[in-house]
């Protein structure tokens, strides 16, 4: 199963988009990717089983590093179709992706 998706290849329609930035990083930012729901990565066990099993799940953190990697590992281990955006929200913006106020 693929682990990542390039920002320029991502089409948001039909995807379940999750912001997994750490709380401190999310609080320091005024923006998010449209349609994203924030889930605290430190509470993964509390919300992982609530995710839809019939949709592709796309995650992002700040730069597509350790946070996204760890969450994708955990979700894929549960059989979910999860990937993360290469470069995180910063890569998304650099590729011309839209952001909105959170």
Predicted regions and their residues:
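Rhodanese-like catalytic fold shared by cysteine-dependent sulfurtransferases
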Residues: 1-16, 20-58, 63-102
């Amino acid at each position: 199963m693929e682990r990542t998706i390039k920002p320029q290849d991502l089409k948001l329609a039909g995807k379940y988009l999750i912001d997994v930035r750490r709380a401190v990083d999310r609080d320091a930012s005024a923006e998010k990717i449209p349609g994203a729901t924030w889930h605290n990565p430190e509470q993964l066990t509390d919300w992982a089983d609530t995710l839809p099993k019939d949709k592709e799940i796309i995650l992002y953190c700040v730069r597509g590093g350790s946070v996204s990697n760890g969450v994708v590992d955990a979700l894929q281990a549960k059989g979910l179709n999860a990937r993360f955006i290469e470069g995180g929200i910063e890569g998304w913006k650099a590729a011309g992706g839209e952001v909105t106020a959170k």
